[in-house]
């Protein structure tokens, strides 16, 4: 009897208890994460009417109409430009900063300086940088004029607005720098010393020892950078509302405008589904190459 009771207790503790603990988080994950995805997929086949739901069934017409507009493809082009800038300026540069920061003696003090800008709310950060880019009294044009250049209308120039939106990420990318720095400091000193004895120092040490040992952190940050860039909404919208002339309109802004300005829920849902599929495929490709390198 005691043995049977013990088995029941073991079964409850090892098999049932974990599921009971995870039941509520799983429920909210399904409700708040996966249900909206299936709901968006469902709505994308309707001329959705929020009052008389779900509205008229139109099949793939929302997708056809969306693919036939130049505005939609311009939003994709802008999203990929932002992706390139995000990788170049907010992904690669923090890696380089962390490598140099690791060579300094007072790295703890400087690490704190990197962390402080991340505490500034996005709204306040945008207000500060809009002032920096102001064509009349902004710091950016003061610097340009100091070096003999011509003042620029930064946020009103289609060729400059993307750079202006991404550039603050270099200053606010302190968390990424600290993650890379932590990964670098986590490399075993024995590995570094052995490499030094074999003549692997300087740039060779960075290329053959440091970067391979922080590859997983780089991969995670790369996935986050890709996902963030493809879904970018807040910064382009607060800086330029997708302008000028749609030059900073991303897929995020396109979807937002479809819902909030045009009240075209079917088109917005269709765009959301396509964006989700693109991000998913890109993430799977990245994971495939990461796994291939491990093998």
Model-assigned labels for residue ranges:
Residues 1-12:
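Short, Lys/Arg-rich, polar N-terminal cytosolic tail immediately upstream
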